[in-house]
Swiss-Prot record:
Family named by the database record: Belongs to the type-I 3-dehydroquinase family.
Any GO MF annotation of the entry: 3-dehydroquinate dehydratase activity
Protein name per UniProt: 3-dehydroquinate dehydratase
Active site (record annotation): H144 (proton donor/acceptor), K171 (schiff-base intermediate with substrate)
One Pfam family named in its UniProt record: DHquinase_I
Catalytic activity entry: 3-dehydroquinate = 3-dehydroshikimate + H2O
NCBIfam families (alphabetical): aroD
Organism of this sequence: Klebsiella pneumoniae (strain 342)
Gene3D superfamilies, A to Z: Aldolase class I
Residues involved in 3-dehydroquinate binding: E47, W48, R49, R83, R214, S233, Q237
Example of a GO biological process term: 3,4-dihydroxybenzoate biosynthetic process
C-alpha cells in the first residue's frame, strides 16, 4: 500500500487518477489568457511549462509571471516545470540555471509542486529536494523518453531510483514503437505499484498508440494523467472532457 500525497485540496493516492492540464504560452499575455481558460475546465492541477516562456532566462520575469499565474489560477494547485531540451522541452539552459530556477520557484510560496528530472547531478537533486520540502513544496521526479520504451526492469529501476532520491511522486513517460511497448509500460507500472512503491506513481505511454495508458491509471497504478485544453505539451494527450468521460466509464 502506497502512502497518499496531499497537495492543497487534492490527494494523490492508490485507486485514483487525477488530471493535470498544461499551461503553455510564449508571452505573459498568452499565458494569462490560457490560464483564465483553465480555471473552469475541470482540471485537478495545472502544470506551467515554463520552458515555453520566451523570458525564461530572466529570473525576475519568471517570478513576476509566476505571481500573476498564481493569482489567475485561484485555488488550483500549480506544478512548476522546466522541461529540458533533451527530454522534449522547448528551451535549453545550463544545469546551474535549471537548479536555480527550480529552487527560486520552490521558495517563492507560489507553487505547490516542482518537477526535477532524474538524469541530473545527484548531489544537486538531493539539495533541491531538501529545499523544496523545507518550503512545503512536493516534488515530482521525472524521466521522459521520446524515442523508445525501455525494458520493464529499466522502467522499474528508474522509478525506484526516484523514490530513493526523495521524490514524492515518481514519474516516467515513454514512447511506444509497438503495442508490446504499451504493455511493457503498463506491466512495469503494475509491478512497481504492487512490489516496490511507497508513494503514488505517474506513468504513461505517449503517442496515439499509448493512449490506453492515459485512461487506465486506476487499474494499473498511475495516480495522474495529462489532459488538454487547447495546446498539448506531449504526444497523445487527450482533451480533458473526453479524458474524464472515458476514465469514468472504465472505473
Amino acid at each position: 500500500m502506497t502512502n497518499a500525497v496531499t497537495v492543497k485540496n487534492i490527494t494523490f493516492q492508490e485507486g485514483e487518477t487525477l488530471i493535470c492540464v498544461p499551461l503553455i504560452g510564449k508571452t505573459l499575455d498568452e499565458i494569462l489568457g490560457n490560464a483564465h481558460g483553465l480555471v473552469d475546465a475541470g482540471a485537478d492541477i495545472i502544470e506551467w511549462r515554463v520552458d515555453h516562456f520566451t523570458q525564461v532566462r530572466d529570473m525576475t520575469q519568471v517570478m513576476a509571471a509566476l505571481a500573476e499565474i498564481r493569482g489567475a489560477l485561484k485555488a488550483l494547485p500549480l506544478l512548476f516545470t522546466f522541461r529540458s531540451k533533451k527530454e522534449g522541452g522547448e528551451t535549453e539552459i545550463s544545469d546551474e540555471a535549471y537548479f536555480a530556477l527550480n529552487r527560486e520557484a520552490a521558495r517563492s510560496g507560489l507553487v505547490d509542486v516542482i518537477d526535477i528530472e532524474l538524469f541530473n547531478d545527484e548531489a544537486q537533486i538531493h539539495a533541491l529536494v531538501d529545499d523544496a520540502h523545507a518550503a512545503g513544496v512536493k516534488v515530482i521526479m521525472s524521466n521522459h523518453d521520446f524515442h523508445k520504451t525501455p525494458a520493464q526492469e529499466d522502467i522499474i529501476y528508474r522509478l525506484r531510483r526516484m523514490q530513493d532520491l526523495g521524490a514524492d511522486l515518481p514519474k516516467i513517460a515513454v514512447m511506444p514503437q509497438s503495442p508490446q511497448d504499451v504493455l511493457t509500460l503498463l506491466a512495469a507500472t503494475l509491478t512497481m505499484k504492487e512490489k516496490y512503491a511507497t508513494r503514488p506513481l505517474i506513468t504513461m505511454s505517449m503517442g496515439k498508440s499509448g493512449g490506453v495508458s492515459r485512461v487506465t491509471g486506476r487499474l494499473f497504478g498511475s495516480a495522474m494523467t495529462f489532459g488538454t485544453v487547447g495546446q498539448a505539451s506531449a504526444p497523445g494527450q487527450i482533451a480533458i472532457a473526453k479524458l474524464r468521460e472515458v476514465m469514468d466509464i472504465l472505473s
